[in-house]
Swiss-Prot record:
It comes from Arabidopsis thaliana (Mouse-ear cress). Pfam families: zf-RING_2 (PF13639). It is a single-pass membrane protein. This is Putative RING-H2 finger protein ATL49. It catalyses: S-ubiquitinyl-[E2 ubiquitin-conjugating enzyme]-L-cysteine + [acceptor protein]-L-lysine = [E2 ubiquitin-conjugating enzyme]-L-cysteine + N(6)-ubiquitinyl-[acceptor protein]-L-lysine.
């Protein structure tokens, strides 16, 4: 025990003699003092000036965007003078293009490929489907840029685009509301009937020219046959044949230039009909080259209406009218709400096609320059009286949206179909 006690005392003396650990200095006060020393009034002044500049530039941008934008007339003038490159840039930036209305597509002229004046032996190509034009193919012409395409190809394209697929020129600028009011010519091909058929709507008399008067506008439709008019009065129509220029081209390989290129072109054009009327252009680089030397034209018949037949309002198109089996409904709506363009044939059923062909066979023969064909079906006076008496008893078919709402609400409404008399 005597030995252990002095050893414990010695260890305590050693522990007490060791220096204490150093204290950690506080850096918070030093960092704040450093920031205060670094931020000077000059830096604060620069930050304030930059923020004011950005604020003023944003206000100027808003003023330029909303207050200094060009008017509608200047926009139309700009689109009329737009170039091909500007049209391509516009198509790239305006990806929300909803296309052209079907009624506007139906007004574009249609012609046969064989009716082109100045056509050479070598066939031209369609830039949309990459197929060669054949003699019996129907082409639709864009009068603004004079480019022609297959009817099915260009109709499908224009339903989702409002520009030419080749030069990207805007079609809507040439068919604005102001242009429609000032234009009094209707382009109809001389050797081709229109792609739209008229529903058999006639009055009790035997005249084919009639007026349809509405509260908002009046539309006058005249046929082009003098023998159908008992008085022979055709003062409202003046026919002129105007040749229109047609620009066509063909695909050529730009990788092989020389003597072998002509042979390859001929082999491509000769073997193009082997694969479902289409060619494979995935190998190599091809360009659609226009034939600048060839002067291709199509003779088009124009009809000029007199001053009393011109309507100072928007022209009623075929696809904007409804159809009612009664006589009063016929006077209000001249045609069915359907477009008879070739691009929408697949939407109609077989029965409807058979009805259209039978009605077409019974129509009276018009001249080929007439843009609208009126089937010669008369409405008997007895049937007209029956339809007038039964008009109050007939209930119109509700719309699809209303039927859907009734179905969702759980209602069961009886829909009475109007009985149409077969003429």
């Amino acid at each position: 025990m005597n030995k252990i006690l002095p050893e414990m005392k010695s260890t305590q003396n050693l522990i007490s003699s060791s220096p204490p650990p150093p204290l950690i200095p506080l850096k918070s006060n030093t960092s704040l003092s450093n920031l205060n020393s670094k931020i000077t009034p000059n830096i604060l002044l620069i930050i304030i000036i930059l923020s004011i500049i950005f604020f003023i530039s944003g206000l100027l941008h808003i003023l330029v965007k909303f207050l200094l934008t060009p008017s509608r007339e200047s926009r139309e003038d700009y689109f009329d003078n737009v170039t091909a490159l500007q049209g391509q840039l516009q198509q790239l930036f305006n990806l929300h293009d909803s296309g052209v209305d079907q009624s506007l597509i139906d007004t574009l002229p249609v012609f046969h490929y064989k009716s082109i004046v100045g056509l050479k032996i070598s066939p031209f190509d369609c830039p949309v489907c990459l197929c060669e034009f054949e003699t019996e193919d129907k082409l639709r012409l864009l009068p603004k840029c004079s480019h022609a395409f297959h009817v099915e190809c260009i109709d499908t394209w224009l339903l989702s685009h409002s520009t030419c697929p080749l030069c990207r020129s805007n079609l809507l600028s040439g068919f604005s509301s102001h242009h429609n009011l000032s234009s009094s010519y209707l382009l109809v091909l001389e050797s081709e009937q229109s792609s739209r058929d008229m529903v058999p709507v006639l009055e009790s008399n035997s005249q084919l020219g009639y007026d349809v008067n509405n509260d908002s506008e009046s539309t006058r439709i005249r046929s082009g046959r003098k023998s159908c008019d008992p008085d022979g009065d055709m003062d409202g129509l003046d026919e002129k044949v105007v040749p229109l220029e047609v620009k066509l081209g063909k695909f050529r390989n730009i990788d092989h230039v020389g003597e072998g290129s002509d042979q390859k072109k001929n082999s491509i054009s000769g073997n193009s009909k082997n694969v479902d009327g289409r060619r494979c252009l995935s190998m190599g680089s091809y360009e659609y080259i226009m034939d600048q030397e060839a002067t291709l034209k199509v003779h088009v018949s124009t009809k000029k209406l007199s001053g009393k037949d011109r309507v100072p309002s928007h022209r009623t198109v075929m696809s904007e009218c409804g159809f009612d089996p009664t006589v009063k409904g016929i006077e209000k709506s001249v045609v069915e709400r359907e477009s008879f363009s070739l691009s929408k044939i697949w939407l109609r059923g077989k029965k409807e096609k058979q009805k259209g062909t039978s009605a077409r066979d019974s129509d009276c023969s018009f001249v080929s320059s007439s843009s609208l064909r009126f089937p010669n079906h008369r409405i008997p006076p007895e049937e007209s009286l029956k339809s007038e008496n039964s008009e109050s008893l007939e209930t119109k078919t509700p719309s699809f949206a209303r039927r859907t709402m009734h179905w969702l609400a759980g209602r069961q409404n009886k829909i009475v179909q109007p009985s149409t008399s077969n003429v």
